[in-house]
A protein has these predicted regions:
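Conserved, single-site charged/polar hotspot
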Residues: 1-202
Length: 205
């Protein structure tokens, strides 16, 4: 298989060149630095094992703990879904009647505040749905748009484990944190080390 050189901007090239010999480690081993677009307000506790979009991925990983990410509100992906009678997506309508959902219960959360499952109510009947949204961290806000059409909004994008891209942007822009401070915030107990000829041990997943 042949690979061609990736085309990128000079700014990106300089950024990569500046840190090319640095690695993020935990107890001497290179970490699996997972990340997602937006974590809502807290990242999830990361655990490995059976692949799941919920909080539990298997056994606990010490450097993937729930941490604060307070700048998400300004930078997160804000999504709105119309749930009026003309909305046809089955995940927001009762598949039996076609009627829009009337309410949602998202109180079933883990310690990081992430919804484990949600219960939607339509015509007095309750249905439990798991992992039917783009994010495992979301908050429902029922209301109407400018035209009076019922809408539901939620925030967060991705699995929410490890570094949040939106949160990292917020920490840099609002608090002046550098990349080392941001990485050490999101990866609990991790250290940035310089790569040497004595290679660091790699993690095994």
């Amino acid at each position: 298989m042949l690979y061609s050189e990736l085309q990128c901007s000079e700014a990106i090239r300089k950024a990569v060149e500046a840190v090319k010999d640095e690695v993020l480690t935990y107890n001497g081993s290179v970490i699996d630095a997972v990340w997602s677009a937006s974590a809502g307000y807290n990242t999830q506790t990361g655990v490995y094992g059976t692949c799941s979009s919920r909080d539990a991925w298997g056994t606990e990983v010490p450097y993937l703990q729930s941490v604060e990410s307070p700048y998400e509100e300004q930078y997160h992906n804000l999504l709105r879904r119309v749930i009026g009678k003309d909305y046809t997506y089955i995940e927001y309508n009762d598949s039996r009647t076609g009627e829009p959902y009337q309410s949602a219960d998202t109180t079933h959360k883990d310690l990081g505040g992430f919804v484990q499952y949600n219960t939607l109510v339509s015509n007095g009947r309750s249905y439990r749905y798991i992992n039917q949204f783009v994010s495992s961290r979301y908050c429902f806000d029922f209301g109407t748009d400018a035209g009076g059409t019922p809408c539901m909004t939620y925030y967060g994008f991705g699995h929410g484990v490890g570094m949040s891209q939106c949160g990292a942007v917020g920490y840099a822009a609002e608090k002046g944190m550098n990349y080392k401070q941001i990485l050490q915030h999101y990866y609990t107990g991790a250290q940035i080390r310089t790569r040497t000829t004595r290679s660091l041990s790699l993690i095994h997943i």
